[in-house]
Amino acid sequence: MNKRASGVLMHITSLPGDYGIGSFGQAAYDFVDFLKETKQTYWQILPLTTTSYGDSPYQSFSAVAGNTHFIDLDFLIRDKFLTKADVKGADFGLDPEFIDYAKVYEARRPILEKAVKAILADKKEAKKFEAFKTKNANWLADYAEFMAIKEHFDNKALQEWDDKKAVKRDKATLEKLRKELAEVITYHEVVQYLFFSQWAELKDYANENGIQIIGDMPIYISADSVEVWTQPHLFKLDAECKPRYIAGVPPDNFSATGQLWGNPIYAWDKHKAENYAWWVFRIQESFKLYDYLRIDHFKGFSDFWEIPGGDETAENGEWVPGPGYDLFKVVKKELGDLNIIAEDLGNIDDKTRQLLADCGYPGMKIVQFGFYDTTGNSIDIPHVYTQHSVAYTGTHDNEVINGWYDNLTQEQRDYTDAYINRRQGEPITRALLRTLFATVSNTAIATMQDILDKPENSRTNFPNTVGENWKWRMLPGEITVDKKEFLTDITERYNRGNN
């Protein structure tokens, strides 16, 4: 990221389509075409991992396995693994702009089960699946077993499974369950084959058209995950895999009680003793999917907020030293120089800044944050940005521009309008996007909602809440000629064009 360029943040879930949720189908290829046409370089997405409670891509059943909601059904029909009759009449939800996750899950499962049977019955495809299974043996079998056993126990979280011997991976218990659940285990293996096959085709298409994929890696793992089940020694857990300490961030101006994320805390001493092998593996697997990798909550590698496991708020936590540069030194030694972006937002201190400098990764800048202080002294105001950074209007955790602007005070709105030289009648989204692309940051990333001038209810996520997040989808036809021309204009005007 050492030259001026730009891109768009748009998660797969938010792509339009007929089956209730975005996928790796034609709409994704059309989106690549849109990026190419508007001279973009990057497509930034959120984690592709399988989602769990709350539908958050940052709370996953696995650090590696893919979200099977993204498998495109039309492509399965094209490839003769499904028929149109298999999907006809299924209820994926009625609202094309907001995802109904319960309906999507219920409708897709029996359809995907039919596709799995067709693949296993096709000798050529079954052979490809077996090759995939062998290539990914270091994680796939454990994941498929975890998901099958989880379903066997009515989809309860790992810590609530009825048979505690299964939680503790008793050998005889697991052998019995493997035999009993063999068909379900195979299902979970095959749908992973489909996920990775379709993603590889889409990524190849993006790369062939000059578009690089920026992926995302959460720092933490869900307590209800295959990693906690198979490698409990790497986390601070009790004998039943329940977290003794959980992750979050302390109270601040935006949250009086802090944020309680609920993820188990790493036993960093155990990771160090194993030369951070799990982290090397995890990052290596990520770069099989992406060209660049945003690492979430980079502060947590410097110091992390550790909260007692039973607490209901983040108030009683404390800062505990993280692994620091020791981890990234090993990653560099094992994997070489990597295209990593550090999410360095929030409680950033000199120690974290030093870690970022030692690693050499670009950090992030959020344009919205610069205008709460109307004196011009904010550390987030655009005139203090540096070239070695990635600038955003906002991320998935922030308000869309229209919602953000509406919630400013009149003084803040007046200051913002004057600072960005907003023209009479100019939409605030366009004025702020223009400001973003004009910054000295080598990389500028615009959220799709802002390009489309969407209202407040299109926000992707409201941190520390569950139930109404990760739902927004773009509607067919929303990318108008006018919007494409505007994006192309600011991209070329500020020397970010990918020619």
PLM features: residue spans?
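Short alpha-helical segments and helix-capping/turn motifs at coil-helix boundaries
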Residues: 26-33, 197-205, 279-281, 428-432
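Catalytic domains of carbohydrate-active enzymes, especially glycoside hydrolases
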Residues: 26-51, 289-290
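Surface-exposed amphipathic alpha-helices with a cationic face
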Residues: 36, 199-207, 332, 356-357
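Domain-scale activation on soluble regions of proteins
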Residues: 37, 148, 165-168, 173, ...
